[in-house]
């Protein structure tokens, strides 16, 4: 699906997946074009309690002063992968991505993000939190790219995970690719089990 958000417009999309059938493959693609001062809010909630396989891809192109916010709640399907590619093409554009994994029963969920800071004075914020139990696995791969023209970039990325079972697995791959020298970018990841 293609969405064009004109100047000073806003759009809120709430995707709730609660499929009752035993086995499905679901593939979604959204292409968002945000013009000046546009605001996008996208909520992705997966509550399917079955053997579904789901893949979701968002491409977001942002103009000056636009804001995109993506929230992912991931606790349903057997296998789920969310990918977000965001291109900050206008000054003072901002992208915010928040994700929560709450997994059990041998589920495998992934979030992969790529935030591309292409001009000056752009901002991104990514925060992913996970609670894993019963042989489940989650993956977070987040990339912040800063082009040579993207001075004054502010990029932040953090992932945290609590492992409730010794057979769970959390893999984090934070990436920074920076070609400008006047930027503020950081990334971090922490995971561990609770004390007995």
What are these regions (language model features)?
Residues 1-196:
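Conserved beta-strand/loop scaffold segments within soluble protein domains that form the structured core
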């Amino acid at each position: 699906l293609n969405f064009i958000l004109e100047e000073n417009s806003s759009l809120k999309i709430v995707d709730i997946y609660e499929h009752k059938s035993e086995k499905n493959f679901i593939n979604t693609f959204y292409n968002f074009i945000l013009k000046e001062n546009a605001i996008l809010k996208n909520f992705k909630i997966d509550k399917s309690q079955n053997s579904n396989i789901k893949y979701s891809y968002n491409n977001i192109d942002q103009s000056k002063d636009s804001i995109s916010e993506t929230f992912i709640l991931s606790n349903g399907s057997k296998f789920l992968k969310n990918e977000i590619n965001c291109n900050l093409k206008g000054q003072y554009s901002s992208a915010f991505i928040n994700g929560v994994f709450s997994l059990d029963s041998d589920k495998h969920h992934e979030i992969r993000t790529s935030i591309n800071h292409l001009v000056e004075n752009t901002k991104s914020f990514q925060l992913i939190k996970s609670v894993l139990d019963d042989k489940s696995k989650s993956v977070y791969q987040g990339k912040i790219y800063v082009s040579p023209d993207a001075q004054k970039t502010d990029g932040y990325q953090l992932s945290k995970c609590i492992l409730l079972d010794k057979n769970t697995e959390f893999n984090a791959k934070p990436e920074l690719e920076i070609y400008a020298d006047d930027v503020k970018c950081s990334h971090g990841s922490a995971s561990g089990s609770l004390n007995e």
